[in-house]
C-alpha cells in the first residue's frame, strides 16, 4: 500500500476502498450488471466443446461439397442444436458456450493440437482453462480424430521449405515454436476484423438473404463460373442468414418460456420484451436502440461461432452506427442515458464471458492474460471529414470511468480538430487508471490508407480492430496473420556467426563471419542487414504459402454476406485476391528498442570510441554479465532510442528502412501489402526467452522491448522525448508501414488535478501532430503492482494495460507482471 502522501489513480483508490471494506456507491446503483459480473468474475474459464462437436458432425456429412456450402450448413447445424441460454438479470442474450466464462474450440484451424491442449490448458501459466472429463472425452474420441490430417496447421507445416521450417518450428510436426520467424496464421483464420454492423441494423439478415436470392435468380444457367462458383456461394449466404435468424428465434422462444414461468413481475416484463426483440432482430431492421444493441450482439456472437477471426471480431464504430437509434429514442422519451448505459453494460459483461482460447502453446504465450481485442471505436471523423463525436461518444467514456471491467477494449480516434471537450474527457478517462482508452491517430492512418488505394471517404470511416490495427469495412479484405520476426535473434546471429546460444550449433542464420575480425562499423552493419533480410525472406516465403493454403481450409459465409465486394463478386472473404479489395497484411518487428540500443552501443563503444573490443563485448554477453558488470554499465550508457537522441534514432530509422524497402520490393509478388508493423501483443516475453544477453545490457532470456516503445529504463528524457524518437525512427517517404504500438506509463502524481489533465491533453495533441499511429497509457504507482504480486487475492480486480488491451494484473504470468513493473515510470511531462 502507498504512503498516505502518494497520490492514487481513481482506479487504485477504488481498489483500496474495496480492500478496506468501504461501500461502493456505483455498485449499489448498478445492481443488475454487478450481479452478472459476480457470477463469473475471478473464475477460471471453461472450455465448451458444443460448437466444435456440432461443427464437426456437420462437416462429416458434407464431404465433397463446395467448402463455402459446407461451412454454411455447419453453421445451420450449430444454430439448430447448440444450447441457448439467458443469464439471470441479463437484458441482452446470445452466448456461444456454457454459463460463466468460456472458450470455444475451432478444430478446423489447429485441431492437431487438441490432444496436447487438453492436457496442457488446465496447467498453463499463461491463460489457463478448465475442461470437464466428459468434454475432454468428446474432444479426444469424437472431434480430434476426424480432423487429423485435415487441419490448416498440418497443411502449412508440410508446405514450408526446410530452411524456412527450421526458423519457424522446433520440431517436425510444427507443434513447438522456434520463436525466431514465427507464423501466426495457425491460431487464427485471419487477422483482426470489423464487420459492417450498420448493414444488419438497416437491412436485417432477411434483407441480406433476399439480396442473395435475387442474385441467384439472375445467374446465367449456362455459365460455368455462375454454376460452379457463384451459385454455391450465394446458396451459402441464404443458408447462413436462415441460420442466424433461427438462432435468434430460439432465444425468443426461450425468453417467452422463461417469462411464462417467471413470478417476479419486473423480470417477467423484461423477458417478454426480450422475446419480442429476438423474434424481430436480427432478421429485420432495428427499430430502436435496444433492438440495435441486441442485433449487433447476435451478429457478433454468431460470427465468433462461425470462425476464429483474428483475436476476436471487433465492434467497430459503435458511437456512429448506434447514434441514430439512441438520438431518436432520447428525443422521443423511450430511453434515458442511464437505461441506455445499462443495456451497453449488459453487453460488456456478455463480452467478458466469452474468452478467446488459444490451444497452441505459442498462441497462449503470445496472448497472455486472456487477451481480448473486441475494440469499440469512438470519435474520429465522418466519411465527409467532419468531427464525429456525439453524445454516445461521451457515454462510452463515462462507462469506462464508472464500471470497473476490462471489457470491452476502447479505442479513441484522435485528429487535429478533435474538440477540446472530447480530449478532456479522454484524458480524464486515461487518468482513471485502468488503461482506457488507447489512442489511434487519424493524421497518420487516413493519408496512409489513401496512399494504399482507399478513397478519403473509406479511409475516414476506418474502425480500430485488434491491438492497434484499423479496418475499412467493405474495402479491405481478409489477410492471414503475418510472421512475428525476432530481430534480436538476427542480431545474436551476427555475434555468433549464424547461431544462437539457445540452440547450440544449429546453423539457423547466415554465416556472416567472425565479428571479432570486423574492422569497421560498416562491416558489422552489413552483417546485420544480411541476417535481417534472411529473416524477412523466410517471412515472405511463409506468407506466400499461407496465402495459397488458407482458401483451401476456410470459408466465412456470414462475414462475406456483410461485405459489399464479396456480394458484388460472389466471392468468399477468404479468397486471396478479391477485385477492388485492399489486402492489408504485415510482418511484425520484435525487439525494436533492444536491437537499436544494442547496435548503437556497438557502433559507439567498439568502433568509434574504442572503449571496448568486440571480443570483450561477446565475452560479457556469453557469461550474462556475471563478473562483467562494468561492461554492462558501459553498454547501458550508450545512446538509447526513446530520448530524442539522433545518434540512436538514426539507427532506428535505418533498421526500419531495411524492412519498408523489402516490403516495397517483394509485397507485389504476394498480391498484397505486406508492411512492417510493431505490435507484439505479449510475444516480446516468449521471444526474449530464446535470446541470450544483448549488447544494450539486457540479461539473457528476459523480455525484449515491446512494440515501438523504448527498452525499459532506457528512456530517461521524459515522455515527450519518447514521442519524438518514435517520429524520428519512421520512414515517412514509404507507405509500406503499418501499426506501431507505443506504451507510456505515468504515475498518478504526474497527471494529478486539472493541471495534470491539461498536460495530458497537450501530450495527446503532440502525439497527434507528430502523426504517430498509436499510444496507450498505464497510470499507476509501481508500489501498487508490487503489492498485487505479493497479495493477488486482495488485488483481484486490478486492471492494467498490456498490449492493446487491458487485463487483470493477477491473470498475467510472473514474467509479464515483472515486465510491466519494469516499464519506465514517468513522473513528469
Curated annotation (Swiss-Prot):
Query: Any idea what a deletion of this gene does?
Result: Cells lacking this gene lose the ability to grow with isethionate as the terminal electron acceptor.
Q: Which GO terms describe its molecular function?
A: lyase activity
Q: In which pathway does it act?
A: Organosulfur degradation; alkanesulfonate degradation
What are the positions of the active site? 467 (cysteine radical intermediate), 469 (proton acceptor)
Post-translational modification, briefly?
A: Requires the activating protein IslB to generate the key active site glycyl radical on Gly-804 that is involved in catalysis.
Modification type Glycine radical: residues: 804
Query: Which Pfam family, any one of them, does this sequence belong to?
Result: Gly_radical
What induces this protein's gene, according to its Swiss-Prot or TrEMBL record? Highly up-regulated in the presence of isethionate.
A single GO CC term for this protein reads: cytosol
Instruction: List keywords of the entry alphabetically.
Output: Lyase, Organic radical, Pyruvate
PFL domain residues:
31-699
Catalytic activity line of the entry: 2-hydroxyethane-1-sulfonate = acetaldehyde + sulfite + H(+)
Q: Which residues bind 2-hydroxyethane-1-sulfonate?
A: 188, 192, 467-469, 677
The Glycine radical domain, residue ranges: 706-829
Q: Which cysteines are joined by disulfide bonds?
A: none
Look up the EC number in the record and give it: 4.4.1.38
Highest taxon of the lineage:
Bacteria
Family statement drawn from the similarity comment of this UniProt entry: Belongs to the glycyl radical enzyme (GRE) family.
- Role of this protein: Involved in an anaerobic respiration pathway that converts the sulfonate isethionate (2-hydroxyethanesulfonate) to ammonia, acetate and sulfide. Catalyzes the radical-mediated C-S bond cleavage of isethionate (2-hydroxyethanesulfonate) to form sulfite and acetaldehyde.
Name listed for the protein in its UniProt record: Isethionate sulfite-lyase
Amino acid at each position: 500500500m502507498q504512503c498516505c502522501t502518494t497520490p492514487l489513480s481513481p482506479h487504485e483508490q477504488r481498489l483500496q476502498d474495496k480492500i478496506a471494506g468501504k461501500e461502493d456507491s456505483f455498485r449499489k446503483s448498478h445492481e443488475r450488471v454487478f450481479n452478472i459480473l459476480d457470477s463469473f468474475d475471478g473464475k477460471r474459464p471453461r472450455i465448451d466443446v458444443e460448437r466444435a462437436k456440432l461443427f464437426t458432425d456437420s462437416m462429416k456429412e458434407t464431404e465433397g461439397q463446395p467448402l463455402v456450402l459446407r461451412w454454411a450448413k455447419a453453421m445451420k447445424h450449430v444454430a439448430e442444436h447448440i444450447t441457448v441460454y439467458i443469464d439471470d438479470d441479463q437484458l441482452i442474450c446470445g452466448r456461444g458456450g456454457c454459463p460463466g466464462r468460456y472458450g470455444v474450440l475451432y478444430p478446423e484451424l489447429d485441431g492437431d493440437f487438441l490432444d496436447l491442449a487438453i492436457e496442457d490448458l488446465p496447467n498453463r501459466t499463461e491463460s489457463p482453462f478448465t475442461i470437464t472429463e466428459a468434454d475432454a472425452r468428446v474432444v479426444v474420441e469424437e472431434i480430434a480424430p476426424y480432423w487429423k490430417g485435415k487441419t490448416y496447421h498440418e497443411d502449412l507445416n508440410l508446405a514450408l521449405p526446410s530452411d524456412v521450417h527450421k526458423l519457424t518450428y522446433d520440431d517436425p510436426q510444427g507443434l513447438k515454436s522456434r520463436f525466431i520467424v514465427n507464423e501466426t496464421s495457425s491460431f487464427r483464420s485471419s487477422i483482426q476484423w470489423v464487420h459492417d454492423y450498420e448493414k444488419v441494423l438497416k437491412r436485417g439478415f432477411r434483407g441480406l438473404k433476399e439480396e442473395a436470392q435475387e442474385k441467384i435468380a439472375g445467374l446465367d444457367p449456362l455459365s460455368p463460373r455462375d454454376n460452379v462458383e457463384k451459385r454455391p456461394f450465394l446458396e451459402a449466404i441464404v443458408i447462413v442468414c436462415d441460420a442466424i435468424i433461427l438462432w435468434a428465434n430460439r432465444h425468443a422462444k426461450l425468453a417467452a418460456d422463461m417469462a411464462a414461468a417467471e413470478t417476479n413481475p419486473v423480470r417477467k416484463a423484461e423477458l417478454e420484451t426480450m422475446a419480442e426483440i429476438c423474434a424481430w432482430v436480427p432478421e429485420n431492421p432495428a427499430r430502436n436502440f435496444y433492438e440495435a444493441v441486441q442485433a449487433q450482439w447476435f451478429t457478433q456472437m454468431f460470427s465468433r461461432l462461425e470462425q476464429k477471426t483474428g483475436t476476436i471480431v471487433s465492434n467497430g464504430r459503435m458511437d456512429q452506427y448506434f447514434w441514430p437509434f439512441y438520438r431518436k429514442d432520447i428525443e422521443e422519451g423511450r430511453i434515458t442515458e442511464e437505461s441506455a448505459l445499462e443495456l451497453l453494460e449488459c453487453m460488456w459483461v456478455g463480452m467478458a464471458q466469452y474468452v478467446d482460447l488459444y490451444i497452441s502453446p505459442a498462441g497462449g504465450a503470445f496472448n497472455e492474460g486472456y487477451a481480448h481485442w473486441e475494440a469499440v471505436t469512438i470519435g474520429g471523423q465522418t466519411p465527409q471529414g467532419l468531427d464525429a463525436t456525439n453524445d454516445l461518444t461521451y457515454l462510452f467514456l463515462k462507462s469506462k470511468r464508472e464500471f470497473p471491467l476490462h471489457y470491452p477494449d476502447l479505442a479513441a480516434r484522435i485528429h487535429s480538430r478533435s474538440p477540446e471537450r472530447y480530449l478532456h474527457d479522454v484524458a480524464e478517462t486515461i487518468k482513471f487508471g485502468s488503461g482506457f482508452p488507447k489512442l489511434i491517430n487519424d493524421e497518420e492512418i487516413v493519408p496512409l490508407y489513401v496512399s494504399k488505394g482507399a478513397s478519403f471517404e473509406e479511409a475516414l470511416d476506418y474502425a480500430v480492430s485488434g491491438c492497434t490495427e484499423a479496418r475499412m469495412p467493405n474495402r479491405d479484405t481478409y489477410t492471414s496473420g503475418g510472421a512475428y520476426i525476432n530481430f534480436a535473434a538476427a542480431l545474436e546471429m551476427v555475434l555468433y556467426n549464424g547461431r544462437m546460444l539457445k540452440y547450440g550449433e544449429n546453423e539457423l542464420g547466415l554465416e556472416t563471419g567472425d565479428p571479432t575480425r570486423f574492422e569497421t562499423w560498416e562491416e558489422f552493419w552489413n552483417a546485420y542487414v544480411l541476417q535481417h533480410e534472411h529473416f524477412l525472406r523466410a517471412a515472405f516465403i511463409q506468407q506466400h504459402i499461407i496465402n495459397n493454403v488458407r482458401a483451401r481450409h476456410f470459408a466465412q459465409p456470414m462475414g462475406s454476406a456483410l461485405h459489399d465486394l464479396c456480394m458484388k463478386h460472389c466471392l468468399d472473404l477468404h479468397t486471396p485476391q478479391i477485385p477492388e479489395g485492399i489486402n492489408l497484411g504485415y510482418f511484425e518487428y520484435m525487439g525494436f528498442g533492444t536491437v537499436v540500443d544494442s547496435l548503437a552501443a556497438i557502433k559507439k563503444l567498439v568502433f568509434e570510441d574504442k572503449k571496448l573490443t568486440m571480443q570483450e563485448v561477446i565475452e560479457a554477453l556469453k557469461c550474462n554479465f556475471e563478473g562483467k558488470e562494468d561492461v554492462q554499465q558501459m553498454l547501458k550508457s550508450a545512446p538509447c532510442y526513446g530520448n530524442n537522441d539522433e545518434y540512436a534514432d538514426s539507427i532506428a530509422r535505418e533498421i526500419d528502412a531495411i524492412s519498408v524497402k523489402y516490403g516495397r520490393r517483394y509485397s507485389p509478388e504476394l498480391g498484397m501489402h505486406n508492411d512492417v508493423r510493431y505490435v507484439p501483443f505479449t510475444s516480446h516475453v516468449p521471444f526474449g526467452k530464446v535470446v541470450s544477453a544483448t549488447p544494450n545490457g539486457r540479461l539473457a532470456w528476459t523480455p525484449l522491448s515491446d512494440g515501438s516503445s523504448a527498452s525499459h529504463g532506457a528512456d530517461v528524457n521524459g515522455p515527450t522525448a519518447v514521442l519524438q524518437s518514435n517520429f524520428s525512427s519512421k520512414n515517412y517517404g514509404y507507405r509500406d508501414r503499418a501499426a506501431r504500438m507505443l506504451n507510456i506509463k505515468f504515475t498518478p502524481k504526474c497527471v494529478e488535478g486539472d493541471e495534470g489533465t491539461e498536460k495530458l491533453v497537450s501530450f495527446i495533441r503532440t502525439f497527434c501532430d507528430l502523426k504517430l499511429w498509436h499510444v496507450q497509457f498505464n497510470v499507476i504507482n509501481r508500489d501498487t503492482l508490487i503489492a498485487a504480486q505479493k497479495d493477488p487475492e486482495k488485488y483481484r480486480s486490478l486492471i492494467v494495460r498490456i498490449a492493446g488491451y487491458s487485463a487483470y494484473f493477477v491473470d498475467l504470468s510472473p514474467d509479464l507482471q515483472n515486465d510491466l513493473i519494469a516499464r519506465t515510470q514517468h513522473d513528469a511531462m
